[in-house]
Amino acid sequence: MYLIIKKTHKLPHWLQKVSLSIMLIIFLWKPALLADMHIEITCGVNAAHPIAVIPFTCVSNQYNKSISIEDIASIIAADLRNSSKFNTIPVEYLPHKPTKVSDVIPTFWEKLGINIIVLGTVHINYDESYIISYHLIDTSSNPALIISENQYSVEKKWLRYVAHAISNEIFEKLTGIKGAFCTRIAYVLRIHNDHYPYELYISDYDGHNQISICRSTEPLMSPAWSPDGKKIAYVTFASGHSELVIQALNTGLVNNIVSFPGHNGAPSFSPDCKKLAFSLSKTGSLNLYIMDLESGEITQLTKNRNNNTEPSWFPDNQNIAYTSDQGGSPQIYKINVKTTEIQRLSWLHTSNQNPNVSSDGTFIIMVNRHQGKQNIAKLNLLTGQEEILTDTLLADSPSIAPNNTMVLYSNINKDLTTKSNLELISIDGHFKAHIQGDQGDIRFPTWSPLHLE
């Protein structure tokens, strides 16, 4: 049984879209949520562009000590740093902390090689609502030049999302790329020696605001977001064998999709949200199938005695990348859903699997196995170039950020003594980060779409 807590007060238009995708789904019989995870940078930040995010200033006469104003700036700084594009300067190294644009002295920042800074203010109203404003400033000109600014009015519970939204605006202004800081991730958490050892969670991309949407005594696997961000498909063994289900996030309702004898797995929504691809073994070997989600009609896509699984749609809704051992060892192939024409895509080493196609269809992230190691690899579909991005032992389940800048994956450290955790890596492999948590094993991470409705 679920309790669905929805928004009750009118929010700005931009935040209404966010709020609908962030329903707080809480089990009535689960008294507390997990402690938030946090991101620890492990490689690559020094090569990024320096930027300073000044602690935001409180301008209210009724200062509320329950909110740390510095938290908003720190969230923005962390977002920009996590993007791999920016190196945010620690607060203790700032030459000065201006509170308004007219206080900015460009020569102070020039000495540090910093030409972009962020200023902001927080006004706390008597009704405990908040007005957040920011200025993105170019300090290479004298006087300093405002290149972007905005203001938001929200309740306290939305402050963290406002910070992420500001990060999105700053990131897009400076890079021309849509920010993905308001997105969510889903993953399976296994806690050993627990009555319900398997739980499906959703959280902010950075591990904050974790919410359990399903818990089970039996395994949960392979969560997949719908393109509109309203549903998640996943595999459950609650009935004693594998089943594919789709859960609506705003109601918690779960619909059984397929439950054939044998294996039912690897769900993947088409970009237009009209179809669901998956793998079944009802004929003996694993083959790909597609369901029309409106009619429920199922069509078999591959028809051979090999194992064909892990489908990932191309953005054209007409082609699917998948894993097949039809050549002897697992490799990545592409199949056209209308003609069923098949093309091999990967050639790196002897084994590649678990493909994830970028939202623009220009590259694939996959799992490469070679010489006893399992790494995340990238296949450039424009040039055919293949490259290893990580140096790991058991990296698995890669998921590309919806703006195609980062990859999220699960990993077990090389010493094999620690649990599986989540890690981030930039598309070029230069930036790496570890999402810290003190829970159990985290598996099957998947990134939400860019625009949650």
Curated annotation (Swiss-Prot):
Report the main location listed first in the record.
periplasm
**Name under which the protein is recorded:** Tol-Pal system protein TolB
Task: List the cysteine pairs that form cystine.
Answer: none
Q: Which InterPro entries match?
A: 6-blade_b-propeller_TolB-like, PD40, Tol-Pal_TolB, TolB_N
* Origin species: Blochmanniella pennsylvanica (strain BPEN)
Q: What role does this protein play?
A: Part of the Tol-Pal system, which plays a role in outer membrane invagination during cell division and is important for maintaining outer membrane integrity. TolB occupies a key intermediary position in the Tol-Pal system because it communicates directly with both membrane-embedded components, Pal in the outer membrane and TolA in the inner membrane.
Subcellular localization is given as: Periplasm
- Quaternary structure and interacting proteins, as annotated: The Tol-Pal system is composed of five core proteins: the inner membrane proteins TolA, TolQ and TolR, the periplasmic protein TolB and the outer membrane protein Pal. They form a network linking the inner and outer membranes and the peptidoglycan layer.
